[in-house]
């Protein structure tokens, strides 16, 4: 996000945030968006392309871009980076065999200049499944401690199925973004 975008948001006080939600396929991105919005999560289909959900959260309007995570779609993720205020990376904490892929894709995202100023929330999802790695274990696998010190980030354990941890994560994300782009509040 450039300086002009920040100034524009301060001046207009538009109270909108653009959130990009990505992660490998079947990590729970769509379920999380629906759960936060209080919608039915009993029947979820894989996201082929993207969905945009606009929700009011606290006193802000969140435009959440839920982008499919299939291998064939990942090369298109870069089309959604512009003007992203917050990046949500969703990890299936129970899918141990794909954690290397997960780390590689996150590393690639974090190299993107257009995402450099975005707050990063890592949701260690599926904590309700026996054998799932804890958020600390996921953090070690993803090597989060080596991340650029200027990046604002947080990892939160959650369950899209039960809803546990989702509010904690989104509360942090919204407050972190607000403290950066709505400085005059």
Curated annotation (Swiss-Prot):
Binding annotation for GTP: 23-30, 66-70, 125-128
Note: Belongs to the PILZ group of genes that disrupt, when mutated, the microtubule cytoskeleton and produce mushroom-shaped ('pilz' in German) embryos.
Tissue expression notes: Expressed in seedlings, leaves, roots and inflorescences.
Subcellular localization(s) per the UniProt record: Cytoplasm
A Gene Ontology BP annotation from the UniProt entry: embryo sac cellularization
Record note on disruption phenotype: Embryo lethality. Embryo development limited to the formation of a few giant cells lacking microtubules but not actin filaments. Failure to localize KNOLLE in mitotic cells. Giant nuclei and nucleoli found in both the embryo and endosperm tissue.
Similarity comment: family membership: Belongs to the small GTPase superfamily. Arf family.
CC annotations in GO: cytoplasm
Gene that produces this protein: ARL2
Protein name (database record): ADP-ribosylation factor-like protein 2
Cited Pfam families: Arf
Subunit structure, interactors included: Supercomplex made of cofactors A to E. Cofactors A and D function by capturing and stabilizing tubulin in a quasi-native conformation. Cofactor E binds to the cofactor D-tubulin complex; interaction with cofactor C then causes the release of tubulin polypeptides that are committed to the native state.
Keywords: Cytoplasm, GTP-binding, Lipoprotein, Myristate, Nucleotide-binding
Lipid positions (N-myristoyl glycine): 2
Molecular functions per Gene Ontology: GTP binding; GTPase activity
Function: Has a role in the cofactor-dependent pathway of microtubule biogenesis. Not essential for cell viability. May play a regulatory role in sequestring TFCD.
Coiled-coil regions listed in the entry: none
């Amino acid at each position: 996000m450039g300086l002009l975008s920040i100034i524009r948001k301060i001046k207009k006080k538009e109270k909108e945030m653009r959130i990009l939600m990505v992660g490998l396929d079947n990590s729970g991105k769509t379920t999380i968006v629906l759960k936060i919005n209080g919608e039915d999560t009993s029947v979820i289909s894989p996201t082929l392309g993207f969905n945009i959900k606009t929700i009011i959260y606290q006193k802000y309007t969140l435009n959440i871009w839920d982008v499919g995570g299939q291998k064939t779609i990942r090369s298109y993720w870069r089309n959604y980076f512009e003007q992203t205020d917050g990046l949500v990376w969703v990890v299936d904490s129970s899918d141990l065999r794909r954690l290397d892929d997960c780390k590689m894709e996150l590393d690639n995202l974090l190299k993107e200049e257009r995402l450099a100023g975005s707050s990063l929330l890592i949701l260690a999802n599926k904590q309700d499944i026996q054998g799932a790695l804890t958020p600390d274990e996921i953090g070690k696998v993803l090597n989060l401690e080596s991340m650029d010190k200027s990046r604002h980030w947080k990892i939160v354990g959650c369950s899209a199925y039960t809803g546990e941890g989702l509010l904690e994560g989104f509360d942090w994300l919204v407050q972190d973004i607000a403290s950066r782009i709505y400085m005059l509040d």
